[in-house]
Amino acid sequence: MRNLQFDHDALEECTKKFNVEVHGIPECEGENLADIIIKIGQKISVDITSEDIDIVHRLRKKTPTTKPIIVRFNSYRKKREFYQARFNLKTTKISEIIESVRHEVEARIYINDNLAQRRQELLVKARKMRKAKNLVRVWTVDGKVFVRKTEEPRPVRISEDWDLENLAT
């Protein structure tokens, strides 16, 4: 059963390889999500054209918060370039991307890997451990969750709950 779950997780992750999630962009009536992604690309110095985007839409959420945008790129290379440049958004205001948004809106824009549900759960648990000061760093690369317990150079890949449990001991 465990192998079946692992195979399902790997297959789901493979289907999300070209995807990123963009959080923090408020919904506007008549919005053009492809244009928003292109503007974000300009802001982070990544040349994105409409031909680079396979599909872009908002995800449904159970809570009434701003729905994230999911982008599927046509090439893995463009997805990686966009994802790796995400740190350039740290000082960007939403009004710099969407002119119709008031300047008072100070929320940040985040770009994340689009993770399979199981890996998203592992990421949430790892982040809780980081907040509890049990881990120094938590991040994802290509849908895989990595952590550092100390500042040592070698990260630990987290595939299952017991990987995190072993780090806690």
What are these regions (language model features)?
Residues 1-169:
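C-terminal folded interaction/catalytic domains of modular proteins
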